[in-house]
């Protein structure tokens, strides 16, 4: 078949497959365009979790992992897997970056751990914190404080009280550490430059000012939050105090801090807030995006100086802070193979997923490759996306329609965020609206691509919206799933000529694209073309 132009890769974020049910917002939605594409063109299901994407067995996938695997055309072993192995073989306890932080703290200073406290495995894992606490004990650090960020998004909404109780048990077992503050991830892990949220978290961590109150027992604080209808993700930052009502452990000048989140996108902003006076960049972060707004919202003179701030992974290539697990360099990924063939490609997403179709899709490289253009559509300014389930999908469809009509691009990579971002609310009606909005956009894109003689690959990076009710509790499920996702090959006469093989994974998408585009597949790509040519006699 002739090379289609353009080839459009559509990533329906959070659009997994599960049998129809009252918990499946995708099956409950009216989606005539998607259903027709599924009927008229070759399709299969592919894996997006566990060992298929470089995660521990049974671990649900996520957007970062998904886009890395898609763009790399191979299984990319994730930081969680690397850290798990380092704990297992004890190399983590000999890591020089961590030893330097421990040595700094053992010199009469305080050591602070902070990050997402859960077993969700998307941004962090509580087992990593437990290992760090053991290491601090072994290295003679005396004053250790933990500032947990509560999850409720990649875990059940009220599991946080269990995680805090488990943490306190571990601290008693090891004889080290106290919980100093608690913040919902909504505040401490924002990624949309909403500095007012980070201010509430940093006020608790730095100044002992808790908008959510002061508690001797953090479990009591969490339970009171639940009683007010506020679940883990949205817990208003509160401070833990001693018998004299004094904050137990605020971050002070010269302290050591270790952010134990391994996923970068939601660790970046809190790092920018806290490390501005501690060598985050040569210019103290002043050259970074929205630095003036940050300094106006959280004045620089209110931030501690000379922190020994350590990042678990590389949160931003511009940061000059110590890193525990440095990034791998991926070569011969789809992006540089397209560049080598002088192919023009466009990346399109709204704010929430822009980094995924650019930075993560490009193997952790921020700078665009030659021939690569990017179009960012602003996400709506709402507290949570169930309030605006349409998000900016129609704006994305506008961009794609214009780009296809113009005929300037060989490849277009697009992410529709709705099913994932609204699915995280755990609310079925708005998630149905989100799915139906994306379906309408699919119809628009298909019409213009067909008219221009192009082709589409429709898939997802992980599941979410297909499982909105927790089967054990009967309550809302806000986390991703381990379900497979659809993969549809939309092209003229595709159903006559091709079938798609089963048991594929995200690593197979780039090889499939290269097969369609006629680009030789490099040996570094270990995925395989998902197409089976029915016209070739065996």
UniProtKB/Swiss-Prot annotation:
Active site: 63 (phosphoserine intermediate)
Record-level Gene Ontology MF annotations: manganese ion binding; phosphoglycerate mutase activity
GO BP, sorted A to Z: glucose catabolic process; glycolytic process
Entry GO terms, CC: cytosol
Xref: InterPro entries: Alkaline_phosphatase_core_sf, BPG-indep_PGM_N, Metalloenzyme, PGAM_B_sf, Pgm_bpd_ind
Biological role stated in the UniProt entry: Catalyzes the interconversion of 2-phosphoglycerate and 3-phosphoglycerate.
Name this polypeptide is given: 2,3-bisphosphoglycerate-independent phosphoglycerate mutase
